[in-house]
Amino acid sequence: AIGETAKDLKAEMIVMGTHGMKGAQKLFGSKALKVVVSSRIPFLVVQGKPAKTKIDTILLPIDFKRENKEKANWIYYLSRNFGSRFIILKSNARDKGFKRKILSNIKYVETFLKGHDIAYEIVTASGNESFKKEIVSFAKTHDADLILIMATRDIRWVDYMLGAPEQYILANPYNLPVMCMNPRPAKLSSGFRAAGGN
């Protein structure tokens, strides 16, 4: 119903509030999470009152999934509307295949940012902890105002996602705002596979 209402209103995003970690965990039960991942409209999830009124710095995690390239339109939107700068956190993968895909995603996003004169910097994750945890801790230590992530493409994995990286980031312990976008259906996504581009 939320997604349909937002579509009828031609909303550009859905803002959803929670009350701390427990509220976030309750929110992302199977039914509500299905709403989030099935909506074509991005969700902006907030756990409390923002520390600032501006979105100056946005953390943009990039891993091996091809869906990362779909963030481009929202990078442009956020930059133009909020004047935001982006910190690209590059996943520190050891697998050669993953490294190749990560570099491809980085090159694509970097070309887009340069082409639209958007301020950014690239930082490689340390790899000392899981990428999902490093995303959250990095955002906290670097005062990011927003984390921009993609949801898992295949809606059939909604129950699995209760323990997936997206769930941890959305319900992060630092109450950081997170914008969650959903990949386009496979048939609309330039040949991207429904399983997440692996």
Model feature map: region roles:
Residues 1, 128-132:
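Charged docking surfaces used in two-component/phosphorelay signaling
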Residues 3-51, 140-193:
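Gly/Ser-rich helix-loop-strand patches that form or flank binding pockets
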Residues 20-22, 64-66, 92-97, 126, ...:
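Short histidine/acidic/glycine/proline-rich micro-motifs that form metal-
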Residues 38-39, 49-89, 95-116, 141, ...:
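Short acidic/Ser/Thr-enriched loop-to-helix initiation segments
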Residues 25, 68, 128-129, 162:
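A conditional alpha-helix N-cap/helix-loop micro-motif detector
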Residues 44, 87-89, 121-126, 142, ...:
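General small-molecule cofactor/ligand-binding pocket signal
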